[in-house]
């Protein structure tokens, strides 16, 4: 089968032919119908320090996968050949993150992926493979950050910093929870989609949130220009949820953090149950992830687009589509 392989930091991705996977006990093979592209893939490619996560090398990248089960291993009872499934990026409990596809074992940038049954979530009717794939991280991560880590409730005021794929989902999720939402992105072109997603207003600088004093600020960027200013801009007693890995080190105004009783919380991924809830929201039409298809053979070039900040919403690819054919609907 065809797969996009990563051989080490600083080395280009390569399209290779690799053996088809075979499921052992408790595992299944999923024919991948859609796989999302993520900034975390860029972090892996750059060799960024990911804390306790150790990236296997070489490895097939891709941690946002969805498709159809084509074979099952011994002992698999709750799923069967033909089931439509998303492969959850389970990070709660956080110890499970080391088993993430595209990190600890081969991921979704391939025609088929080996997945443990404990990571599978059925895709409801009304949810496309593309939506199901990007939801495993892009939507579920935003859902956990806003709802669980941020404890956003009806009537809250929320700032969302970074209005890319995750940020747009964060805006919509906060709005669905009954919050008044303000968006922040240095690129004015990102403001229109955020306003359409439910933001009341958008700014270019995190410090502009100071006038609103949000109860919660969710930082999907994680850069020196966002995290420190978020701590200063949130209301006294408020919380800042840090999701982005834009910088290896953040400068935090300690006096503002301590004297104003601000909580700074790191947030990684989501639970399998949260992914189920996200799928139901998409099935009901309450959430509609913005997606754009890129041909599988052009995935390395698409990653370059992502690195340059040229993507609004979320990119995905169809590894099983004919490599000679361009984009099409899923």
What kind of feature is each model-predicted range?
Residues 64-66, 83-84, 112, 157, ...:
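Residue-level marker of beta-strand positions
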Residues 79, 88-118, 125:
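Cysteine-cluster motifs in flexible loop/terminal segments that predominantly coordinate metals
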Residues 1, 228, 275-330:
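C-terminal hydrophobic helical "lid"/dimerization subdomain
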